[in-house]
Amino acid sequence: MNLILKFRRSFRTLIVLLATFCLVSILISAYFLYSGYKQEMTLIETTAEAECADIKDLPYRSIELRTIKPIDTSKTDPTVLLFVESQYSQLGQDIIAILESSRFQYQMVIAPGKGDIPPLTDSGKGKYTLIIYENILKYVSMDSWNRELLEKYCIEYSVSIIGFHKANENSLPTTQLKGFPLNLFNNVALKDCSVNPQSPLLHITKGPKVEKGPLPGEDWTIFQYNHSTYQPVLLTELQSEKSLSFLSSQTLYATIIQDLGLHDGIQRVLFGNNLNFWLHKLIFIDAISFLSGKRLTLSLDRYILVDIDDIFVGKEGTRMNVKDVKALLETQNLLRTQVANFTFNLGFSGKFYHTGTEEEDEGDDLLLRSVDEFWWFPHMWSHMQPHLFHNESSLVEQMILNKEFALEHGIPINLGYAVAPHHSGVYPVHIQLYAAWKKVWGIQVTSTEEYPHLKPARYRKGFIHNSIMVLPRQTCGLFTHTIFYKEYPGGPQELDKSIKGGELFLTILLNPISIFMTHLSNYGNDRLGLYTFVNLANFVHSWTNLKLQTLPPVQLAHKYFELFPEQKDPLWQNPCDDKRHKDIWSREKTCDHLPKFLVIGPQKTGTTALYLFLLMHPSIISNLPSPKTFEEVQFFNGNNYHKGIEWYMDFFPTPSNITSDFLFEKSANYFHSEEAPKRAASLVPKAKIITILIDPSDRAYSWYQHQRSHEDPAALRFNFYEVITTGHWAPPDLKTLQRRCLVPGWYAVHIERWLAYFSTSQLLIIDGQQLRSDPATVMDEVQKFLGVTPHYNYSEALTFDPQKGFWCQLLEGGKTKCLGKSKGRKYPPMDSESRTFLSSYYRDHNVELSKLLHRLGQPLPSWLRQELQKVR
């Protein structure tokens, strides 16, 4: 009994002691939490006067420079994984615009509220080098399983995260970011933004400097923290203490912070708003560079060329006088202090010399007396648009007049650059313009804003046609009517906004090479051209580490294609699909001469038979024959493509009814061409695609026999088995023959390439065996696929010729029209050794084809079913 009483007393004593200990612990924790928070508040207190001081002297404990774990870029592909709120969210679109302008590869996915994240690795390598969340809350609120997977991937593959937090009316005034020692204060109005010059992520951005004035909007988020992993990147002040009463307006607050990865091993950069504020765009680009280990980074070199079009052109009152020309010369010298080798590039139309007022004519004369101070390029003599000239000789006459004017007045004629008025004839290509340019001026370079389209500007590219390098041209907000500052469209503040962090600044920021289009009228009156580029150069110099420089046009073009060699080959489009393109395309030309469907091959599968069957239909019309490649144009897969769309369209007759008539072409080399799908989709995106498949082993053997019949030296020297089994040591002609035998049979690979550019509804796959045995049924299927009318009865129009061994067209009087002697040749059967080898060689390809056909909902041809049975 006493033992029980003692135990009860001891138990009560233990309970009291535990309760006392818990209470003391709570009091101590509360004290330190409170003092820690107060300490943090004190730590970030400073004044605006300190904003340009050494950041080490600022009272930020977290600003102490710390060692950051280097990013290992070898474990991942240089691709960004972007989680967006929706496909059309504004911030998501702004992020994509910067990624695309910077030419960074990315994959966009909708951020899952619940559910799995996309696969992050492939064959042991990370698929993404950086992860961006449009809404960082989607990241922190992930379920524990997926968040653990994501963070494990980030740690193992040295991957970082960028996140944005955009407060809204439903945001709490204060929030703690789940899983982080980080407090967020939402819906704050801010002003006077400065860059932390000690931030390790700065690359393009220069600090310290202050952007005075209120920041756009009152929905900003500021970050507070009490951990050494965080470092401020962008600092701001409160507009007033009304935002959050417990925050001081005499304090600098971080609206972008960098997480050095000291907390959990993952580096991050967090933004307290979207990208509407221009400095956020600048820091965002630097954050991508830093967090990707410089794999996704922009060079600091920027090449700019300022063209002044329409020299001597313009009505009275809009041209340059003597004072304007002197200002042009003075400003050119001023700009050279910030832009190495800066020189204005003047485009002249000699016909309009001395057509202004007396003062303006004197300005013309001073320009010509200063001819050696500038670079010069020819416009058209009469400022006519080249596409309005339908023959080369007329263009040559105009150019000769301008050239004679240049020679008379000492204007250099050998700079190799020209620009067409309104970019006419450059793209869409007017072949007469390119020929005349080369003949008269020896032009090597031109520029246009129209390729592939005017907007969005970030998609503009260069290309080379007829040995003339075409560079993308940029607008700068100055047009022929933009003469007076106060009358600038939308008000002068719009021009200033474009210069100071807006569209014009971003053009410089995101493009390594920029050719700006301006006009003579922009340098008279209020001289907005001078105002724009002086202020732009000052702004770029003040806020960035970019190195501005100018190169002559030909050197600039070579530099451009050194940077972007993949752009050398053009990608032709239908001029009638873009109103601007149609407006600068000759009215004598038509878009009706383009095919509605393509028979793409592959070779030796029955494409010629299908071609002849199609021609039997009264509404189906093929291309005209080529003198070199017979019934095949072979446009999309080879050098013919560089002859341009006019060359291609000349092969097609004018349809009597563009609605009911179906133009088509058959080129069997298209099937396995790497270029053809992309090129075809660009020019005829709505075209339907027909391909024929037979056993790839039979196709390979048929090609070999075809080459023997055409006396291919390699086919005559080596038997079929030697061809298909030859190794890397083989002579070039044998390797070429082997590729032509084997590679077209990779059916799934090639079809997937076409499906990357055309929808499944645009593709018809024909069973080659069925086409040979039952063509009428196949042709009924083809007619249905094309939607062609009237329905043509092939059962009555085709007859089997036992002597030929295939189906022929039945003519009046019982006569037949069959394929030529070269078709349907009888070859010795394939040897069993080759058959066995090819069956093994194509096994995986056939399995992939079966998966593809299943996905497309198409039946498996009999030959494929037989081959798959061998796999089992």
Curated annotation (Swiss-Prot):
It is found in: Golgi apparatus membrane. 3'-phosphoadenylyl sulfate binds at K604, T605, G606, T607, T608, S702, K823, G824, R825, K826, Y827. Disulfide bonds join C808-C818. Residues 589-872 are annotated as: Heparan sulfate N-sulfotransferase 4. It is a single-pass type II membrane protein. Expressed at low level in brain and throughout embryogenesis. Not expressed in other tissues. GO terms for biological process: heparan sulfate proteoglycan biosynthetic process; heparin proteoglycan biosynthetic process. Its main location: Golgi. It catalyses: alpha-D-glucosaminyl-[heparan sulfate](n) + 3'-phosphoadenylyl sulfate = N-sulfo-alpha-D-glucosaminyl-[heparan sulfate](n) + adenosine 3',5'-bisphosphate + 2 H(+). The active site is at K604. Gene3D superfamilies: P-loop containing nucleotide triphosphate hydrolases. The keyword Transferase applies. The keyword Repressor does not apply. Residues 1-13 are cytoplasmic. Residues 36-588 are annotated as: Heparan sulfate N-deacetylase 4. The presence of 4 different heparan sulfate N-deacetylase/N-sulfotransferase enzymes in mammals, as well as differences in their enzyme activity suggest that some initiate heparan sulfate modification/sulfation reactions, whereas other later on fill in or extend already modified heparan sulfate sequences. PANTHER family: BIFUNCTIONAL HEPARAN SULFATE N-DEACETYLASE_N-SULFOTRANSFERASE 4 (PTHR10605:SF45), HEPARAN SULFATE SULFOTRANSFERASE (PTHR10605). Monomer. Belongs to the sulfotransferase 1 family. NDST subfamily. This is Bifunctional heparan sulfate N-deacetylase/N-sulfotransferase 4. The gene is Ndst4.
